[in-house]
Structures are given as structure tokens and as C-alpha cells.
């Protein structure tokens, strides 16, 4: 039963949280918020809710994340983000408006997964092509073309241990207590590499 639970957990992560569509949407959203914050800090006034504006105007670290900031953060929800994205579609900034349109229209970046690390040359050539086509810098093209990696570990002995109470009243970690190879393999960290880029560059 424990093995089935862990196997289901791994499959759930790959099929839901780490599915290419979910991952692509999350990565674009991160790029949108990064660009919005960058513009806000340069003095550009972007339409959004007060809680969202606060976090875009201020550089918050874990050290100064006090009760007041936590209260503001708790006021943020999907409505704040979606409303902002809808408004940002009409902004003059090419990067912010284009990425916002992608999310609203569900026209996401293409994402390619690989067991091997994506060569930097591959992303660089795509950046050059995209930058030239849209008359932007290669640094700005990095909002649309980027590499990274995702990790999935169905079971971590350190983070979320599952312990078995044996008949002799001793407690043992589930992987050590099991003689099944499948269970041991589920505790291994699986890493996949990705590259995101606009579909028209295929």
C-alpha cells in the first residue's frame, strides 16, 4: 500500500504539477510578474490591486516578511492576477503585453523536456532569431526563451519520512524496511531539463 501511494504521488506530480502545460503557464506567469516588477521599479505605473502593487514596488526578503506583509500577501488571489493580466495586455511594453496575452489566451510557449541538459547554444540561437524578428535586445528575448530544470522525488527520507512500526516495537524508515526495489527507486531524485520558446520558432 505504501509503495502504491508513493508511486501515485510521483505520477500525480508529473501528470499535474509538472505537466508541460501547467509548467509552461507557471513559468510564463513568473516572467510576467518579473517584468511588471521591473517596470514598476523604473517608475512605470501599471494597473493592479493594492496588495499586488505593494509587492511590485518593494523588494521583500524572507528576513523582513513580518505579520503586516503576510496579511497583504494573504489578500492576493487569482482575481488580482487575472485582472492585472487583462489590463497589462494593453500596455505599451512589448514584453509585458505579449506575455500577458499568452496567458489570457492560453497560447503558451512551447516547452521541450529532456533527460540531458539543454545546450546554451540552442537557446542563444533562438534568442538571436527572436530578438531580430521583434526588434528587441537578446536580454529582453530571454523573457521568451529560457532554460531550466525540474525535479521530482516521490519520497524523501529527509523531508517527509515515513516510518514503519515493526512487530518488535522498533521503528524503521519505509525504504530500509522494504525489500522491494521499486520502493527504493521511488526515493531517487529525478531531474528533467527544459527549454521554453515561442511556437513560431519551431
In which residue ranges do the predicted regions lie?
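Histidine-centered, transition-metal-coordinating active-site segments
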Residues: 1-202
Amino acid at each position: 500500500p505504501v509503495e502504491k501511494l508513493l508511486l501515485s504521488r510521483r505520477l500525480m506530480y508529473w501528470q499535474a504539477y509538472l505537466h508541460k502545460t501547467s509548467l509552461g503557464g507557471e513559468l510564463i506567469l513568473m516572467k510576467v510578474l518579473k517584468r511588471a516588477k521591473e517596470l514598476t521599479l523604473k517608475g512605470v505605473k501599471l494597473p493592479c490591486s493594492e496588495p499586488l502593487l505593494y509587492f511590485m514596488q518593494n523588494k521583500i526578503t524572507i528576513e523582513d516578511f513580518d505579520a503586516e506583509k503576510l496579511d497583504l500577501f494573504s489578500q492576493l488571489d487569482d482575481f488580482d492576477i487575472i485582472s492585472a493580466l487583462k489590463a497589462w495586455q494593453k500596455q505599451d511594453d512589448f514584453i509585458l503585453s505579449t506575455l500577458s496575452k499568452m496567458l489570457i489566451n492560453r497560447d503558451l510557449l512551447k516547452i521541450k523536456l529532456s533527460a540531458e541538459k539543454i545546450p546554451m547554444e540552442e537557446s542563444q540561437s533562438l534568442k538571436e532569431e527572436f530578438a531580430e524578428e521583434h526588434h528587441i535586445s537578446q536580454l529582453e528575448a530571454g523573457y521568451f526563451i529560457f532554460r531550466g530544470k525540474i525535479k521530482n522525488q516521490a519520497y524523501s527520507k529527509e523531508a517527509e519520512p515515513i516510518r514503519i512500526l515493526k512487530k518488535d516495537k522498533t521503528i524503521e524508515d519505509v525504504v530500509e524496511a522494504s525489500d522491494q526495489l521499486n520502493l527504493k527507486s521511488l526515493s531517487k531524485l529525478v531531474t528533467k531539463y527544459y527549454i521554453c520558446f515561442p511556437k513560431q520558432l519551431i
